[in-house]
From Swiss-Prot:
It is a multi-pass membrane protein. It comes from Mus musculus (Mouse). Belongs to the G-protein coupled receptor T2R family. Residues 30-55, 123-128, 206-236, 283-305 are cytoplasmic. Several bitter taste receptors are expressed in a single taste receptor cell. Keywords: G-protein coupled receptor, Glycoprotein, Membrane, Receptor, Sensory transduction, Taste, Transducer, Transmembrane, Transmembrane helix. CDD domains: 7tm_TAS2R14-like (cd15019). This is Taste receptor type 2 member 116. GO terms for cellular component: membrane.
Amino acid sequence: MNGVLQVTFIVILSVEFIIGIFGNGFIAVVNIKDLVKGRKISSVDQILTALAISRIALLWLILVSWWIFVLYPGQWMTDRRVSIMHSIWTTFNQSSLWFATSLSIFYFFKIANFSNPIFLYLKVRLKKVMIGTLIMSLILFCLNIIIMNAPENILITEYNVSMSYSLILNNTQLSMLFPFANTMFGFIPFAVSLVTFVLLVFSLWKHQRKMQHSAHGCRDASTKAHIRALQTLIASLLLYSIFFLSHVMKVWSALLLERTLLLLITQVARTAFPSVHSWVLILGNAKMRKASLYVFLWLRCRHKE
């Protein structure tokens, strides 16, 4: 592969890592600081904090695994190490995806307006809905790990019986199995986020029709709340789509012999979601936006001194 392209992608990955660590670190520090001071943090801030911490761990894991792959490719390709690393990666990746999806569900129930009795029933029991979502994500995570590890155990047994060819078969099948399983289970939270976005758009459309003859101020307040949430969800879904497509590309890249460039592209695409999305959340959250402005003004004053 062209050395210039490789260096370019590595630089992009490094920038994404720095942006992601600072963005997610900022979210975590702001909320943990309030918690230490004895202030009560809201449900959305609790989700944001859990999301930020899981993404910090995920970004560090991406960086470490990538450098191990580049510097020690032979050691990286041993079946047991591949399995352990992918299991750890799946843990933080699934946590990140489901916390982001929980955030979409939270915004949907807080802002959307429907007269449907099921919606109203769930809206007044939002805390239970969020707990149920996290329990479901835990069940799906366990299934994901089982599906990834079961074929590996079979392949290792085959390797012990016939050492002549099973190692190649092992690595090839494992390289296809992990991204396929993560793509399959990653589609579920993506689909849930997409549904909440579509329903929120429909809610805004219904609201605008219903409030045409209502007071202008009330209409503007609710419409602005819908639009702010939709702006955040649009940016989130765009990054989510790139992330999901990168998993599809990784499944396809497992079939190729010369795949270094494609692996770099998919890695850059995958890292964009936990990295850039943190700043989307900061700009879309009033508390985080205010805190970031305070930090910016403080840094500006320090620079002038």
